[in-house]
From Swiss-Prot:
It comes from the Bacteria. InterPro entries: Restrct_endonuc-II-like (IPR011335), tRNA_endonuc-like_dom_sf (IPR011856), UPF0102_YraN-like (IPR003509). One of its GO terms (molecular function) is nucleic acid binding. It comes from Pseudoalteromonas translucida (strain TAC 125). Disulfide bonds: none annotated. This is UPF0102 protein PSHAa2523. Belongs to the UPF0102 family.
Length: 123
C-alpha cells in the first residue's frame, strides 16, 4: 500500500479531501465558498459556491485513473436525480426563492497528482 492511500481512514475522508481540493480550485477561479457537505434526506450536496449573484451547486467526483471514462463520466442519471432533489431541499430549507442557480461538476482524476476538470451548468 502506498503512502498516499494511507492518508484516509475511509472513503468519506477521501471524498471530503477531494471536495476541499475542488472548493480551493473554484475559489482560485473567483467563486466564493458558501457551504460544504450539506446533508438532507435525499442525499448530499458536496460544495455550494457563489459566482456573482448565482448560487452554484457543485458535484465532485474523483477517480484515480481514466478507466471506464474516469471521473468525467461518473455522474449517473440516478445521482443527477438525487442531486436535484437535494438542491430543492436546500433552497426550501434556506428559504431561497427567485435565486439564480446553476449546477457544476468537478471531475478530479489522478492519484497522487490531480487533474481537475470543471464543467459548468451540466444539467
Amino acid at each position: 500500500m502506498s503512502w498516499f492511500k494511507q492518508l484516509w481512514q475511509n472513503s468519506r475522508e477521501k471524498g471530503q479531501y477531494y471536495e476541499l481540493q475542488a472548493q480551493k480550485y473554484l475559489v482560485s477561479q473567483g467563486l466564493t465558498a458558501i457551504e460544504r457537505n450539506y446533508y438532507c434526506p435525499f442525499g448530499e450536496l458536496d460544495v455550494i459556491m457563489k459566482d456573482g449573484n448565482t448560487l452554484v451547486f457543485v458535484e465532485v467526483k474523483f477517480r484515480k485513473n481514466h478507466a471506464r471514462g474516469g471521473a468525467n463520466y461518473a455522474l449517473s442519471i440516478q445521482k443527477q436525480a438525487r442531486l436535484k432533489r437535494s438542491i430543492y431541499h436546500y433552497l426550501a430549507a434556506k428559504n431561497l426563492t427567485n435565486q439564480p442557480l446553476r449546477i457544476d461538476y468537478v471531475a478530479i482524476t489522478g492519484e497522487p497528482s490531480m487533474h481537475i476538470n470543471w464543467l459548468k451548468n451540466v444539467f
